[in-house]
């Protein structure tokens, strides 16, 4: 069985909705999904540990955009993982990234690239969204070749669009397929 950690921070629920779409898709394919957050905000939240990363076969990682960068909670966590990096414990694990912003040009692509940096430093294999996912060409909201994204609106009231949901599902499917091939 493939074990996948879906790690996220969500301020207003958009990134959590994306994490759930990706998680549901992974579970549909038969993965053991471990949904994790950086801090416990609700009773059902499970906080990430470094052991979670060591034990997983693949990782999906997302936060809202913070001026084109990852949320501080995520950065703080990744800064504690030097011991994993020194031992090469995440090398060759497939990973993908996802993000949400308030506006169409609110920094999603920059954030997705920023989310990728610690994964690449750890030697993980970064998976994007290939253009055989037709929603990349049809979306009028979120979705990039760098990863799934969402445009929440200035009051964070936009629900995931059908295109954004399909892109999240495509990301989950691709992550599962690559992790399965590698295992």
Show the residue positions of the predicted features.
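N-terminal beta1-alpha1-beta2 submodule of the flavodoxin-like/Rossmannoid cofactor-binding fold
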Residues: 1-90, 154-183
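Aromatic side chains
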Residues: 8-9, 67, 77, 98, ...
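Gly/Ser/Thr-rich beta-alpha loop segments that engage phosphate groups in nucleotides
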Residues: 64, 70, 108-109, 130, ...
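Short, glycine-/small-residue-rich phosphate/pyrophosphate-handling segment
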Residues: 94-141
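Glycine-rich phosphate-binding loop at the start of an alpha helix
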Residues: 113, 143-145, 162
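Short glycine/proline-rich, acidic loop/turn segments that cap or connect secondary-structure elements
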Residues: 137-152
